[in-house]
A protein has these predicted regions:
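N-terminal secretory signal peptides that target proteins for export/translocation
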Residues: 1-6
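Bacterial N-terminal signal peptides
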Residues: 9-21
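Bacterial Sec-dependent signal peptides at the C-terminal "C-region" and cleavage site
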Residues: 18-34
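Flexible, processing/modification-adjacent segments and terminal tails
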Residues: 30-39, 46, 107-185, 208, ...
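N-terminal mature ectodomain segment of secretory-pathway/periplasmic proteins
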Residues: 39-118, 153-158
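Short amphipathic beta-strand/extended segments with alternating polar/hydrophobic composition
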Residues: 75-80, 100-105, 119-130, 214-217, ...
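Short, surface-exposed linear segments at secondary-structure transitions and domain or protein termini
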Residues: 82-89, 109-113, 130-135, 222-226, ...
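Gly/Pro-enriched, hydrophobic low-complexity segments
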Residues: 92, 164-260
Length: 263
């Protein structure tokens, strides 16, 4: 039997109806996944001390330390007044010059010193830009699970998978909408079902097609009412991120944000 031609108008109508049905199904599935992601994220935050403890945590201090093959290769000392946005970062730049930057993360304005001398012009601009980058990167390595519900963060449920070491993990996928310095980054946070602990994260930076990098989140300690992971070894790589001299306080220490005395 010869197949009868289907009128173009009917094809168009079927296409619209099918598209609408698929969109509705996809939307419902997406909403369900996002609701699951929200629930897991909230349970994770509750297990780490809860939002009331986060709201009370005004000042953070920490050293962001990079370890390669067991040896320290970089260290950046941070202080952050989360209420005002005032920030201090101290380290050594790529040329080996020690620097200090005092700025505000909201306005991105501030002052910089290199080799103890006030930076001006282009040098100042570069120091401020680099300091803001350190703020974005280094605080995220410390505080990522506390920032799951920040504006511009899209949280989706990416299924259940066996946890390394046993048990089951719920995996949360993080993507970003016009926030941060690299909004195309993707992160997957593995959360244990037993005790709701963040076990590790995987990430792909800048929309790359490379396999995800995995870093374990270990050495959890309670600081100022917040649970924080202080050790992040890379899986399959000779690198490790450590956090030292960590302190969380409900009040600001003004001396941390004061400019250095004139020589």
């Amino acid at each position: 039997m010869k197949a009868r031609a289907v009128p173009a108008a009917l094809l168009a109508a079927l296409g619209v109806a099918l598209g609408a049905a698929l969109a509705a199904t996809g939307s419902a599935e997406s909403d369900a996944r996002d609701a699951k992601a929200d629930a897991v994220g909230k349970e994770l935050i509750a297990s780490m001390g809860g939002m009331p403890a986060w709201e009370k945590a005004r000042q953070f201090q920490f050293d962001f330390v990079v370890i390669k093959e067991g040896k320290e290769v970089a260290r950046f000392a941070h202080a952050w007044d989360r209420y005002t946005g005032d920030y201090r970062v101290k380290g050594v730049d790529k040329t080996g010059a020690p620097y200090l930057v005092l700025f505000n993360v909201n306005t991105k304005q501030g002052r910089a010193w290199v080799n103890g001398v006030v930076a001006e012009g282009e040098q100042k601009s570069k120091q401020l830009e680099a300091a803001y980058g350190r703020f974005i990167n280094d605080t995220y390595w410390l505080l990522a699970p506390w920032k799951l519900f920040d504006p511009g963060v899209h949280l989706a449920y990416d299924g259940e998978k066996p946890c390394p070491g046993g048990g089951m993990c719920d995996v949360l996928k993080l993507s970003f909408e016009n926030v941060g310095l690299t909004p195309k980054d993707l992160y997957w946070i593995w959360v244990t079902r037993d005790g709701r602990r963040m076990l590790q994260w995987q990430y792909v930076l800048g929309g790359a097609s490379d396999p995800p990098t995995t870093a374990e989140w270990k050495d959890w300690r309670k600081m100022g009412g917040l649970m924080l992971s202080l050790d992040k070894p890379m899986v399959g790589q000779p690198f490790e991120i450590r956090f030292e001299n960590v302190a969380v306080a409900p009040a600001r220490d003004d001396s941390l944000f004061a400019p250095p005395a004139a020589p």
